[in-house]
Amino acid sequence: MPSHGDLDRQIEHLMECKPLPEARGQTLCDQARAILVEEWNVQPVKCPVTVCGDIHGQFYDLIELFRIGGNAPDTNYLFMGDYVDRGYYSVETVTLLVALKVRYRDRITILRGNHESRQITQVYGFYDECLRKYGNANVWKYFTDLFDYLPLTALIESQIFCLHGGLSPSLDTLDNIRALDRIQEVPHEGPMCDLLWSDPDDRCGWGISPRGAGYTFGQDIAAQFNHTNGLTLISRAHQLVMEGYNWCQEKNVVTVFSAPNYCYRCGIMAAILEIGENMAQNFLQFDPAPRQIEPDTTRKTPDYFL
């Protein structure tokens, strides 16, 4: 492991939106894998902690998030996935978050989103960005191999269940989730896929997801899951919401989305959720950071919103 000084210098470099050299990126992913392999499918997290939703390569908005919420390690953070794709700076964004994880392993929790996947990143931007910035796909491979080790969910003080997408008809209990083999590419279907792809819905019961993966689940499903597992709340990301956060399903579920003006055109606010020492909840909303000069991108990503 490198010294803290080495990591601090890398983080300082990354905070200026400068990618690491390829070899350092590989070393960083190796270091992170050694940490993540020891973490759980349901990773326990203590409060206080600040919970964050999708980032999607919007690097300068991530810096704004830290300005609003506090820098690590002064603030503990839990990120619920989707660090890459869509935005212009997936490389710098995911590298910074992984570097912070390696430097402050007990203060930063990074979960897997549906975009932390080989297949999705080949379509929605991260793969092409790696080719553009490094001239080859090696860095893409280092990170997508690392993504297989990211925890699927987290549990704050045994009360607030955090994950990227939503529930699964195959998973009634947290112990069911703990029993999954997560170290693999995100499957096209099944319980692991559902955790990263499902959405809450106004209709009761389970429904077919319009996304083509995962399910929709009703208030009755969320309430039963929370009751069965002694939970007070499901916190998830995965869906853009105009105010940055949205309560639903009789406050059994909250969606947090942390990419303001998503895709640089949606005009939405972003939010993060502070969980205090006594489990008190406080939302901090923020607008986009000032626009930077947009990098030249030769290949446009598809418009379909995943």
From Swiss-Prot:
Protein name: Serine/threonine-protein phosphatase PP2A catalytic subunit
Keyword flag Hydrolase: yes
Entry's transmembrane regions: none
SMART domains assigned to the protein according to its UniProt record, in alphabetical order: PP2Ac
Catalytic activity as recorded in UniProt: O-phospho-L-seryl-[protein] + H2O = L-seryl-[protein] + phosphate; O-phospho-L-threonyl-[protein] + H2O = L-threonyl-[protein] + phosphate
Cofactors that this protein relies on: Mn(2+)
Record's subcellular location: Cytoplasm
Gene source species: Hevea brasiliensis
Entry annotation: catalytic residues: 115 (proton donor)
Organ and tissue specificity: Expressed at the same level in latex as in leaves.
Pfam families xrefs: Metallophos
Binding sites annotated in the UniProt record for Mn(2+) 2: 82, 114, 164, 238
Disulfide topology: none
Family note: Belongs to the PPP phosphatase family. PP-2A subfamily.
Main location: cytoplasm
EC number: 3.1.3.16
EC supergroup of this enzyme: hydrolase
